[in-house]
Amino acid sequence: MFNFKKTSIFQHKEEIEVPQYSFEDFPRESHVLAVWGSPGCGKTVTATKLAQYLASRKKDVAIIYCDMMTPMLHCVCPPSELEELHSLGSILSAAHPSPPLIKANVVCHRRNSHLVMLGLKKSENLYSYPAFDEQIAEEFIDNVRELAPYVILDCSSYIAFDILSAVSLMKADTVLRMVSCDLKGVSYLASQLPLLNGEQWNSDKHIRIAGNLQKYQAVDNLAQAMGGLSYQIPHAEEVEQQFLSGNLYKDLTAKQSRVFQKMIIQIAEEVFDV
């Protein structure tokens, strides 16, 4: 395990000599990716698998599960594989979400030293902590950017009510706009995209993705409705089973998952240049 920055959240548990890497070994600046889209399109699965892929490449990555209605930490990873659980709410309810406060509240993965997570704990909700505003959300994302070279924000679908997810779309360097291949997905975007009018959203630069794509679904019609698709992430039975069992950080081994994994790798290469 190593540190990209002196203020990195990835710290050694005991004092050992840290190898000196050349400047070219790591990104010149942190890159923040927001993953957003319609309900059921595979946002959390995609965000988690991207984080897992980066960590498997020994890239230090922080993933933030922004959903304030459905805490996701216990839905993506067995509690036994996580070190001491902390809550994102403890950070956002502070007067200032400072780097030391963030570092003290990250959740570490026992099996992967290049991965940390943030999110609400099981049974918590938006009202479990004092309310926070846009300024706090912006300061939080800025400080996470200073601590980790790769940051993934798993946004909720309900950006009109979720301040952190909405601010994530504004502050991210790249946004994956995902949609399920059905009328509900198309209707969702038709309803929500007008909220993203304005230069601060950069919605014209979103990477458009069809997620959780079933073989029988008419992706051509969806592509036309969305103005084109950059990626088509297929449904994978193995991924679904991992999601149902709350173990999305488990490696994919089934032959049928190869196309899914290929899409994850291609997205990681485009977004993070790894």
What are these language model-derived features?
Residues E146, D162-D182:
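Inter-motif core of Ras-like GTPase G domains
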